[in-house]
Curated annotation (Swiss-Prot):
Domain SPR residue range list: 308-416
Organism of derivation: Pongo abelii
Record's signal peptide: none
GO MF annotation: an example: protein kinase binding
Record's subcellular location: Cell membrane; Cytoplasmic vesicle, Secretory vesicle membrane; Cytoplasm
Functional note: Negatively regulates Ras signaling pathways and downstream activation of MAP kinases. Recruits and translocates NF1 to the cell membrane, thereby enabling NF1-dependent hydrolysis of active GTP-bound Ras to inactive GDP-bound Ras. Inhibits fibroblast growth factor (FGF)-induced retinal lens fiber differentiation, probably by inhibiting FGF-mediated phosphorylation of ERK1/2. Inhibits TGFB-induced epithelial-to-mesenchymal transition in lens epithelial cells.
Domain WH1: 5-122
Post-translational modification: Phosphorylated on serine and threonine residues. Phosphorylated on tyrosine. Phosphorylation of Tyr-228 and Tyr-231 are required for ubiquitination.
Protein name: Sprouty-related, EVH1 domain-containing protein 2
Cystines in this chain: none
Length: 418
């Protein structure tokens, strides 16, 4: 690997743990690359080896145990990406085939989003060194606003467009910098002085809705996505600030204002309920001078009971965790139905007779009429059912299983990470 294409830790837009696979066309199967082993595979932004000043994206894989580089593949616009199953994806570039066996479906989905985002940026041409960020919808809570200055002299009436200045941050994990345009349209030029110190940036704090976590993978953001074990043994980040972060990126500005005065009309309550004595004038009640205590909000209560699932890596609430909520969790009822109905016979037949060159085939009981082998597949299943009559029980059992999932009697449950 040359020095120009060597990725650093900050250049990765997504990084997961997986086993790098290679395709053997002679046997028609996938085998572990260089003897197998868990590798750190990610999509990173690097400079093109041609040295034309343009940058691209590289899929880089490094085995953990010996730091051996087992995968290097540049992302191209004509890359063909195939999701064979939830934990195995493969792609093809220039008649070269690469594959990855992920540790969880969530890792596979994250890597797929990272590759698709890299291809989109290559198509849009936003990876050149002179490209600018023009989509304001991608700006988040860590945006840094810089004031544009007029570059014209005092005697010149010519105004130049504000230039975009992007500086690499040193302390925070990721930070996007952009310039507020058209600042010169409403103010005269003598209001801007180059010798004025720039105001200290403050972090804008927002509280997103906890019902759904939104994960955005942007190659311009230096987001580090860790592997499967890291999510199980590390606390969930993003909801509470990390005290280990640099002080410069952890300031919060609160607007100071006069505290509003509230007029409370309290009901008449017997003083005995509060342990107060009788009023000296003989009245049975007294004025309550204490403010009513604030109860814990429902959101804070739910936050304390939410955990991350080890199977699908989604956040769930312990009180609402019932059967059928996690599709990736193991389910003994579903496994028993497939074994009793001998569905392994149908899988074997479709794999050997109706699979594509990559070994992928359609679900045996799929009703998608757009499949070119729809009629042939069902005719083969009907013929196979004469040899294995127990296959006829699969559809009724599957219908009962779906009813059980709707009634929350069957299906997998979320399991909290340790």
């Amino acid at each position: 690997m040359t020095e120009e294409t060597h990725p650093d830790d900050d250049s990765y837009i997504v990084r997961v743990k997986a086993v790098v696979m290679t395709r053997d066309d002679s046997s028609g199967g996938w085998f572990p690359q260089e003897g197998g082993g868990i590798s750190r595979v990610g999509v990173c932004k690097v400079m093109h080896p041609e040295g034309n000043g343009r940058s691209g994206f590289l899929i880089h894989g490094e085995r953990q145990k010996d730091k051996l580089v087992v995968l290097e593949c540049y992302v191209r616009k004509d890359l063909v990406y195939t999701k064979a199953n939830p934990t195995f994806h493969h792609w093809k570039v220039d008649n070269r085939k690469f594959g990855l066996t992920f540790q969880s479906p969530a890792d596979a989905r994250a890597f797929d989003r990272g590759v698709r985002k890299a291809i989109e940026d290559l198509i849009e041409g936003s990876t050149t060194s002179s490209s600018t960020i023009h989509n304001e919808a991608e700006l988040g809570d860590d945006d840094v606003f810089t004031t544009a200055t007029d570059s014209s002299s005092n005697s010149s009436q010519k105004r130049e467009q504000p230039t975009r200045t992007v500086s690499s941050p040193t302390s925070c994990e990721h930070r996007r910098i952009y310039t507020l345009g058209h600042l010169h349209d409403s103010y005269p030029t003598d209001h801007y002085h180059l010798d004025q110190p720039m105001p200290r940036p403050y972090r804008q704090v927002s509280f997103p809705d906890d019902d759904e976590e939104i994960v955005r993978i942007n190659p311009r953001e230096k987001i580090w996505m860790t592997g499967y074990e890291d999510y199980r043994h590390a606390p969930v980040r993003g909801k509470y600030p990390d005290p280990s972060e640099d002080v410069d990126s952890s300031y919060v500005r609160f607007a100071k204002g006069e505290v509003p005065k509230h007029d409370y009309n309290y009901p008449y309550v017997d003083s005995s309920d509060f342990g107060l004595g009788e009023d000296p004038k003989g009245r049975g009640g007294s004025v309550i001078k204490t403010q009513p205590s604030r109860g814990k909000s429902r959101r804070r209560k739910e936050d304390g009971e939410r955990s991350r699932c080890v199977y699908c890596r989604d956040m769930f609430n312990h009180e609402e965790n019932r059967r059928g909520h996690c599709q990736d969790a193991p389910d003994s009822v579903r496994t028993c139905i497939r074994r009793v109905s001998c569905m392994w016979c149908a899988d074997s037949m479709l794999y050997h007779c109706m699979s594509d060159p990559e070994g992928d085939y359609t679900d045996p009981c799929s009703c998608d009429t757009s499949d070119e082998k729809f009629c042939l597949r069902w005719m083969a299943l009907i013929a196979l059912s004469f040899l294995a009559p127990c296959m006829c029980c699969y559809l009724p059992l599957r219908a009962c299983y779906h009813c059980g999932v709707m009634c929350r009697c069957c299906g997998g449950k979320h399991k909290a990470a340790a």
